[in-house]
Amino acid sequence: VLLRKLFIPLSLILVMLAACNNGPAPEEQIYEHLEEAVSLEEEFREQQEPIVELERKEQELYNKIINLSMDEFDQIKEYSQEAASLVEERQEKIDREKESIDAAKEEFDKIEPIIDDLDEEEQAEAKEEAQKLVETMNNRYDAYQQLYESYQSAIELDKELYELLQQEDLEEETLQNQIDKINDSYDKVIEANEEFNQYTEQYNKQKKTFYESTDLNVEYSEQENGASESESNEQEKEDNPDSEKDDTDQE
């Protein structure tokens, strides 16, 4: 089960800027891009529960399959086809998720040239915090790319598994080798996911620090979007560890 921490949206309730005649001040422009990036990750956020649900359904089918004997091959084949269909649905949602992350990163990147417009003396702290934010976001994005690639590899192995299960002459050793590959692959997914979560948590804290270093009056939402949703998913993972395929005892 993929567990992602999410951006925490912040609300700008009042801005008092002296440079309004020359357009929005740099810190206000940065704020707008940062919060637009949050909005662009909404699609990413919306994929989380459906992905978990698809994984749960697939695990149920897999459990049914391994409890059947080869005398019930027609049922095994039917369940395998259903599971393969669920894998395809997961693929679609993961791709949507990535598109959302990519769009948010593209929006975020717009702040880099604006950081140079922050005053070296009067806004030195804000400038330093903004630069830290860029570094963390880049690390977070790189971590997501690794997570996406790891998950893609795991999905391909899942597809291969359900193709194998539709072969009546499938040998137990071949099946077990495939299951081992899948479990190893999902271990990498979990590791990459933990790194992504760490960078997201770090980013959310640093964004708050950046806002506090400016003249922006920002209200911080009480809804702990990133932490609470991730913690909820962590519990779901414990209750439904889809990332691990059980060994088979089919005969």
Regions inferred by a protein language model and the residue ranges of each:
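General N-terminal leader/first-domain-start detector
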Residues: 2-5, 22-23
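Sec-dependent signal peptide recognition
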Residues: 4-13
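C-terminal motif of bacterial Sec signal peptides marking the signal peptidase cleavage site
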Residues: 15-19
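Immediate post-signal-peptide N-terminus of mature secreted/exported proteins
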Residues: 22-98
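Contiguous, function-dense segments enriched for cysteine-driven chemistry
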Residues: 26, 103, 198
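Extended amphipathic alpha-helical interaction segments
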Residues: 97-183, 189, 201, 210-220
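Extracytoplasmic/luminal low-complexity segments enriched in Pro/Gly and acidic/polar residues
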Residues: 187-251
